């Protein structure tokens, strides 16, 4: 049986070690599961013979907390964890969140803001010359100069502010092994400038071969057009086959150099990574706190792929995992599934089989495997490329094998399907089997908006494509003799969304007959195309000027429009309708969003009625849900 990696000096000594090779410092609790980057990288290093100690969520107020193992032989590895620490701590409205799913018992406050910078500087206070290598999503998406939403300014590469030596960006397996081998052979960290998938600092460009010179930090900080230009260059250099080396000047501080991305893992390499001896659980020291909430959903889920060629503008995957699909073999996934069924808490349900996009199981075209993805076109947007290979046969086969396993009652697909890709496949077997076997009443899909103007900036297919998918999904349900519904996710205040577009979305929600309980407001996180548009007001790939709803008040209005029935939102909804010139939606008609303010008899009070208020003196109207709404529509 696997044992957890050392988290204390005693653990280290119990293994007979005098010193660890690497100390991995992470902002997450220690969960030894393949869905956690800390576990993958540390287990991979262990498999190559390196000794790794883990310091999960050290007390950043005490430098002693970083030194529990003493000085590592080769270096410190630093990550904020599975999530960016600022996204983890703050809502899009910049309010403190109440729960941290990656901490014991969901407790908030066990990691600092900007965890990577804080941890790195903490290390430097004690270990002045020990190599420090950054990894994980926080460091990866801040590897070059970037707009920071929380401070509303352009910030340095995280390599500058952290005092670290290297960034291993992206998924990191290839680069971390190459870095470890270089350090182990005695190469100074300052000389490790050749590893794909890394970022390093240098004084000048004399040893950098044919770099692409990005606008300097001073330029992108002062000029939004320069920022957009820099982002466009970086966006077009995210493919390991075609990307160049990029250099960003920091004046007297020298340069930050980004090497091309590491090559994607082969299927054999993917299988090896997921076959490492993970315990599959959180460390027992968290038992007293009730465990780690983030593990609950993924404990009985299976990762089948990495990468995504969907290229949604608001998603960071292009910068982090890349557009080239990488998959595990059926044998690897089935082996993990069988092991999962033997867990004492397994109830017969596999919660998910997927990745960034569940139904991607092969590269979008054969060209990707040898020449990379196209620099100046997308695979699915605005329409599927003529070279796209849309085929679900492999995924269908995998799901069938999983359904047939002993002890498995049902296999869910919850990580989301790309509905335009489903439609691009002429074979309807996947959609039919998805409806029949892998949905439980509701299928969550992400059309994001209904305005084609907004969808264009989002990099999403037109609304007509989504409506076609709904019709096909309905056919699949009828064929299976089931009554199931698609539950859409929508996003408010994305760049390009004027108040008129927001009202258009509210009208669509009205016609659906339900009110979303939660609304996803666009969150400008580092290194997404949408964030570049948000900050600059420019589409970086076209140079087009883009309207941006920026103020907290306007964002609140757009969010309120999607929840217009909530009485608390009435004034915001009314203001939004006035701005959009849509006062026709204030009244008593069936299509109206809110009723006008009505003066009560006998005094000066006003009644503020949100929604259409179909209730009467005999009682309130029944609550409208997706299920009863569809039932009523069918009865008409």
Where are these regions (language model features)?
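Flexible glycine/acidic-rich beta-alpha junction loops that bind and position SAM and/or redox cofactors
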Residues: 84-93, 141-143, 173-178, 203-206, ...
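Conserved, mostly hydrophobic/aromatic
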Residues: 165, 273, 308, 333, ...
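Terminal amphipathic helices with adjacent charged low-complexity linkers/tails
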Residues: 61, 190-238, 262-265, 292, ...
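Amphipathic alpha-helical packing elements
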Residues: 158-170, 560-604
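Acidic, low-complexity intrinsically disordered tails
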Residues: 371, 377, 593-636
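N-terminal pre-triad scaffold of radical SAM enzymes
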Residues: 25-28, 289-316, 341, 349
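Glycine-rich beta-alpha loop elements in corrinoid/cobalamin-binding modules
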Residues: 37, 56-251, 258-259
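Conserved SAM/AdoMet-binding glycine-rich loop
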Residues: 24, 55, 59-60, 339-487, ...
């Amino acid at each position: 049986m696997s044992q957890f990696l050392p988290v204390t000096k005693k653990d280290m000594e119990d293994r007979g070690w005098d010193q660890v090779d690497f100390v991995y410092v992470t902002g997450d609790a220690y969960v030894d599961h393949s869905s956690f980057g800390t576990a993958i990288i540390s287990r991979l290093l262990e498999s190559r013979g390196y000794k790794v100690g883990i310091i999960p969520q050290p007390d950043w107020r005490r430098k002693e907390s970083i030194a529990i193992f003493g000085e590592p032989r080769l270096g410190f590895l630093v990550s904020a964890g599975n999530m960016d620490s600022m996204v983890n701590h703050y809502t899009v409205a910049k309010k403190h969140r109440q729960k941290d799913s990656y901490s014991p018992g969901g407790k908030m406050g066990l990691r600092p803001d900007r965890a990577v910078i804080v941890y790195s500087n903490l290390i430097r206070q004690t270990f002045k010359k020990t190599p420090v290598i950054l990894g994980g999503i926080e460091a990866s998406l801040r590897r070059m100069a970037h707009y920071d939403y929380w401070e509303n300014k352009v910030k340095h590469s995280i390599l500058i502010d952290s005092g670290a030596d290297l960034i291993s960006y992206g998924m990191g397996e290839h680069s971390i092994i190459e870095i470890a081998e270089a350090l182990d052979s005695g190469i100074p960290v300052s000389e490790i400038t050749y590893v794909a998938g890394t970022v390093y600092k240098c004084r000048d460009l004399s040893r950098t071969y044919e770099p692409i010179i990005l606008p300097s930090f001073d330029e992108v900080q002062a000029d939004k057009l320069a920022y957009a230009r820099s982002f466009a260059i970086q966006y077009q250099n995210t493919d390991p086959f075609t990307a160049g080396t990029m250099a960003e000047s920091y004046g007297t501080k020298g340069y930050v150099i980004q090497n091309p991305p590491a090559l994607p893992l082969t299927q054999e390499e993917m299988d090896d990574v997921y076959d490492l001896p993970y315990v599959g659980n959180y460390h027992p020291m968290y038992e007293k706190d009730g465990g780690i909430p983030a593990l609950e959903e993924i404990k009985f889920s299976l990762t089948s792929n990495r990468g995504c060629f969907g290229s949604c503008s608001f998603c960071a995957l292009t910068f982090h995992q890349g557009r080239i699909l990488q998959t595990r073999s059926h044998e690897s996934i089935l082996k993990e599934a069988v092991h999962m069924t033997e867990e004492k808490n397994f109830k017969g349900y596999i919660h998910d089989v997927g990745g960034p996009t569940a139904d991607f199981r092969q590269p979008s075209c054969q060209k990707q495997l040898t020449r990379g993805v196209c620099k100046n076109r997308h695979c699915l947007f605005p329409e599927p490329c003529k070279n796209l290979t849309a085929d679900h046969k492999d995924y269908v086969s995998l799901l069938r094998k999983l359904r047939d396993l002993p002890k498995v009652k049902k296999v869910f697909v919850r990580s989301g399907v790309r509905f335009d890709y489903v439609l691009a496949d002429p074979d309807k077997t996947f959609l039919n089997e998805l409806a029949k076997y892998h949905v439980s009443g509701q299928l969550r899909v992400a059309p994001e908006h209904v305005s084609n103007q907004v969808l264009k900036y989002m990099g999403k297919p037109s609304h007509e494509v989504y409506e076609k998918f709904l019709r096909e999904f309905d056919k699949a349900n009828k064929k299976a003799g089931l009554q199931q519904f698609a539950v859409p996710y929508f996003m408010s205040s994305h760049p390009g969304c004027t108040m008129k577009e927001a009202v258009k979305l509210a009208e669509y929600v009205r016609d659906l007959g339900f009110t979303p309980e939660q609304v996803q407001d666009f969150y400008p996180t580092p290194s997404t195309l949408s964030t570049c548009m948000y900050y600059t007001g420019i589409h970086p790939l076209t140079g087009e000027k883009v309207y941006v709803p920026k103020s907290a008040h306007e964002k609140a209005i757009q969010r309120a429009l999607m929840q217009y029935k909530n009485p608390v939102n009435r004034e915001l909804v009314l203001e939004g309708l006035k701005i959009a010139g849509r006062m026709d939606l204030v009244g008593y008609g069936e299509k109206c969003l809110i009723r006008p303010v009505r003066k009560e008899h006998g005094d000066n009070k006003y009644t503020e009625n949100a929604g259409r208020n179909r209730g009467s003196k005999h009682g309130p109207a029944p609550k409208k849900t997706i299920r009863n709404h569809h039932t009523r529509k069918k009865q008409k």
